[in-house]
Design a protein with these regions (language model features):
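C-terminal capping alpha-helices of c-type cytochrome domains
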Residues: 5-19, 23-47, 133-193
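Short glycine/threonine-rich turn/loop motifs
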Residues: 48-143, 149-152, 163, 176-193
Length: 193
């Protein structure tokens, strides 16, 4: 309700919503949330892995292709399946218990299912896991092998998978930030009490 009130208090936002959805648009919280979601889905960072998926067989070098094979053969692709290399719901601790599971209050949904995180730009998003207890990508790969695959991945396999994961590093787009509308007399002010 508060979000709707703020957005509706700014004529520039109303104009933008009418431009996007038509002059009879009803600005609701759901529409605002959907609009933000649509915007977020445009924030992609294409990588050499995407180039490879789009048919450029030379986009991945030999070591990255070897890492892809290891990633698939080890079973990582069982959960990291879609173009974003994540996104499905799966159990955590399938074949073992995450060594830092008791740190933090994360439990998953009512069935213990967790959303598999994307691996895009994974080399740039440490620390890892729900509680940020693992800082090394190699250690995260090794831990996932144990708790999700029941596998003691060799140092060679871990290094190979890590090389492949570097192929997920996206090219950052040039971002031109929009000028946000100024608040008006009708815009609710923060409650500082």
């Amino acid at each position: 309700e508060h979000v709707e009130t703020v957005v509706k208090s700014m004529p520039e936002y109303i104009t933008e919503f009418k431009t996007a959805y038509g002059k009879n648009v009803k600005i609701t919280f759901a529409l605002i949330a959907d609009t933000i979601g649509l915007y977020e889905r445009t924030l992609v960072t294409p990588s050499v892995y995407d180039d490879f998926l789009n048919g450029d067989n030379n986009a991945l070098n030999a070591k990255e292709k070897e890492g892809l094979k290891t990633f698939i053969d080890a079973g990582c692709a069982t959960c990291h399946t879609d173009v974003g290399l994540g996104g499905s719901m799966n159990m955590l601790n399938v074949t073992g218990t995450y060594k830092h599971m008791n740190v933090g209050s994360f439990k998953g949904d009512k069935n213990g299912m967790v959303r598999v995180p994307t691996l895009r730009n994974i080399t740039q998003t440490a620390p890892y896991f729900h509680n940020g207890k693992i800082w090394s990508l190699k250690e995260a790969i090794k831990e996932m092998g144990k708790i999700q695959l029941g596998a003691e991945l060799s140092d060679k396999d871990v290094a190979s998978i890590e090389v492949f994961m570097k192929a997920f590093e996206g090219r950052k787009p040039k971002v031109i930030y929009p000028m946000l509308p100024a608040s008006t007399e009708k815009t609710p002010k923060p409650d500082m009490n």
